[in-house]
Swiss-Prot record:
<comment type="function">
    <text>F(1)F(0) ATP synthase produces ATP from ADP in the presence of a proton or sodium gradient. F-type ATPases consist of two structural domains, F(1) containing the extramembraneous catalytic core and F(0) containing the membrane proton channel, linked together by a central stalk and a peripheral stalk. During catalysis, ATP synthesis in the catalytic domain of F(1) is coupled via a rotary mechanism of the central stalk subunits to proton translocation.</text>
</comment>
<keyword id="KW-0813">Transport</keyword>
<dbReference type="GO" id="GO:0005886">
    <property type="term" value="C:plasma membrane"/>
</dbReference>
<dbReference type="InterPro" id="IPR026015">
    <property type="entry name" value="ATP_synth_OSCP/delta_N_sf"/>
</dbReference>
<keyword id="KW-0066">ATP synthesis</keyword>
<keyword id="KW-0472">Membrane</keyword>
<dbReference type="GO" id="GO:0046933">
    <property type="term" value="F:proton-transporting ATP synthase activity, rotational mechanism"/>
</dbReference>
<protein>
    <recommendedName>
        <fullName>ATP synthase subunit delta</fullName>
    </recommendedName>
</protein>
<dbReference type="GO" id="GO:0045259">
    <property type="term" value="C:proton-transporting ATP synthase complex"/>
</dbReference>
<keyword id="KW-1003">Cell membrane</keyword>
<keyword id="KW-0375">Hydrogen ion transport</keyword>
<keyword id="KW-0406">Ion transport</keyword>
<comment type="function">
    <text>This protein is part of the stalk that links CF(0) to CF(1). It either transmits conformational changes from CF(0) to CF(1) or is implicated in proton conduction.</text>
</comment>
<keyword id="KW-0139">CF(1)</keyword>
<comment type="similarity">
    <text>Belongs to the ATPase delta chain family.</text>
</comment>
<comment type="subunit">
    <text>F-type ATPases have 2 components, F(1) - the catalytic core - and F(0) - the membrane proton channel. F(1) has five subunits: alpha(3), beta(3), gamma(1), delta(1), epsilon(1). F(0) has three main subunits: a(1), b(2) and c(10-14). The alpha and beta chains form an alternating ring which encloses part of the gamma chain. F(1) is attached to F(0) by a central stalk formed by the gamma and epsilon chains, while a peripheral stalk is formed by the delta and b chains.</text>
</comment>
<dbReference type="InterPro" id="IPR000711">
    <property type="entry name" value="ATPase_OSCP/dsu"/>
</dbReference>
Length: 184
């Protein structure tokens, strides 16, 4: 993906400054908000990457959308605008979140289910992930009706697949491989 290396460098610098100013948590909240908003708004992403729209317009739009930004986050937006890199703002935000979580030993857990999870079940899953990994986790929920039922949990490079579709595939494979012929 274009701009990923630059996004990592900007995120690292922003995190370093935020740690020095004891604002890493507040900046992380800003970055979560920025990441979600830009990813969910194609128009905003197009505006940020457009070479036709002036930087002053981009800045005023961002400050209008994100009214309560930390001064460090506002400064990061200014630097990205000055350097002509505002188009990678969402990548910088995503990289900041990743680096912040690494710093605080928080792992990303992705749970895939056929139906949305309720808050109680999310809490149970998070406690199990913490129990298994020994570190805090943030949960990202993905809906995929193809798994039919059950869930697939991924934490880092570990995966636990308890989906109905996996069990059906396993059963199908066992039935095909079964060489037992009953005697009549």
């Amino acid at each position: 993906m274009r701009g990923t290396r630059a996004a990592q460098r900007y995120a690292k610098a922003i995190l370093s400054l935020a740690k020095d100013k004891n604002s890493a948590e507040a900046v992380n909240e800003d970055m979560i908000s920025i990441s979600k908003t830009v990813v969910n708004s194609r128009d905003l992403e197009n505006m940020l990457t457009s070479p036709v729209i002036k930087d002053s317009t981009k800045k005023s739009a961002l400050l209008e959308i994100f009214k309560d930004l930390n001064t460090i986050t506002k400064g990061a937006i200014d630097i990205l605008l000055e350097n002509g890199r505002i188009g990678i703002l969402h990548l910088v935000a995503r990289q900041y979140i990743i680096k912040f979580n690494e710093l605080n030993n928080v792992r990303q857990a992705v749970v895939t289910t056929a139906v949305p999870l309720d808050k109680e079940l999310e809490a149970v899953i998070l406690s199990k992930v913490k129990e298994l990994t020994g570190s805090e986790a943030s949960l990202k929920s993905v809906i995929d009706e193809d798994i039919i039922g059950g869930f697939v949990l991924r934490v880092g490079d570990l995966q636990y697949d308890a989906s109905v579709s996996r069990n059906l595939r396993r059963l199908e494979r066992e039935l095909k491989d079964n060489t037992y012929v009953s005697k009549i």
